[in-house]
Amino acid sequence: MAKRVQVVLNEDIKSLGNDGDLVEVAPGFARNFLLPNKKALPVTPTVLKQVEHRRAKQAEKEAAKKQEAIDFQTALTTIGRFTVKKQVGEDGVLFGTVTNGDVAEVVKEATKKDIDRRDISIPEIHGVGKYKVQIKLHNEVNAEINLEVTSY
């Protein structure tokens, strides 16, 4: 009897691997848990071809997303400066703060493209002036924009 069997995972399993990974597991684990619950498939030449095809499609999608992020990064740097208007006191200190949501809204107005506010990293802004803001567009692509805070 085989000590280990190979299976291809259909979904991410924390202790084993990710969707599409070829892993070796105990025969009982495969027979009693993975295969009946459709979490894995036994390894056959057909299944291996399907996995390779799925990986190729996923790599194409990832490359397209990365290229889109690079294009958007170029667009952001072309625009140059984004302006946020806030209420300011007599001493030049802001009432409230400039939030990630404010920056996302300004970028959306200028580019017509939504950015998740959680992907924006801003320094603490307490007054009017110019600041550098980091935006994560993709796992490998970041953009730095110039943000100007003015009073209205």
Curated annotation (Swiss-Prot):
InterPro entries: Ribosomal_bL9, Ribosomal_bL9/RNase_H1_N, Ribosomal_bL9_bac/chp, Ribosomal_bL9_C, Ribosomal_bL9_C_sf, Ribosomal_bL9_N, Ribosomal_bL9_N_sf. GO terms for biological process: translation. Pfam families: Ribosomal_L9_C (PF03948), Ribosomal_L9_N (PF01281). GO terms for molecular function: rRNA binding; structural constituent of ribosome. One of its GO terms (cellular component) is ribonucleoprotein complex. Disulfide bonds: none annotated. Keywords: Ribonucleoprotein, Ribosomal protein, RNA-binding, rRNA-binding. Gene3D superfamilies: Ribosomal protein L9, C-terminal domain, Ribosomal protein L9, N-terminal domain. PANTHER family: 50S RIBOSOMAL PROTEIN L9. Belongs to the bacterial ribosomal protein bL9 family. NCBIfam families: L9. Binds to the 23S rRNA. This is Large ribosomal subunit protein bL9.
